[in-house]
Design a protein with these regions (language model features):
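Charged, low-cysteine interdomain linkers and short loop/connector segments
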Residues: 95-96, 100-126
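Alpha-helical promoter-recognition and RNA polymerase-docking modules of transcription initiation factors
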Residues: 1-103
């Protein structure tokens, strides 16, 4: 018999590693759906950020893992309802970090191949 997310979360909060693994396994399809939706909606395949859906799924797993200790079943909320924003936010954090790293790599090269760092207006103007 499959245990509920709320019961598995309560066990995981008490230190049961097997319950945490089961909780992640029970929600793999949801995490995969969120990752695929985000990958398509942000057009990450064409972005040049070197991210794929597996990266987003891994970030989603971490988001779910971080939501476990903060979940309070006494508030009457289902675990996945509580964890969904944490899962999506973890994926968005990964995309933001990848974009920031991509921006830092952007340079302008002249005809001699000399590279100059990108300069923003706020760095030049008073």
């Amino acid at each position: 018999m499959k245990q509920t997310n709320e019961r598995l979360c309560a066990l995981a909060q008490k230190g049961d590693a097997a319950a945490l693994d089961s909780l992640i396994d029970n929600n793999k399809s949801f995490i995969g759906k969120v990752a695929n939706d985000l990958f398509r909606s942000m057009n990450l395949a064409q972005s040049g950020l070197n991210l794929d859906t597996d990266d987003l799924k891994q970030a989603g797993n971490l988001g779910l893992w971080k939501a476990v200790p903060k979940f309070d079943a006494a508030r009457g909320m289902k675990f996945l309802t509580y964890a969904a924003p944490a899962i999506r936010n973890a994926m968005m954090d990964m995309v933001r970090d990848a974009f920031a790293a991509f921006e830092q790599r952007m340079v302008t090269a002249d005809k001699d191949g000399v590279c100059y760092p990108r300069v923003r207006k706020v760095e030049v103007l008073p």
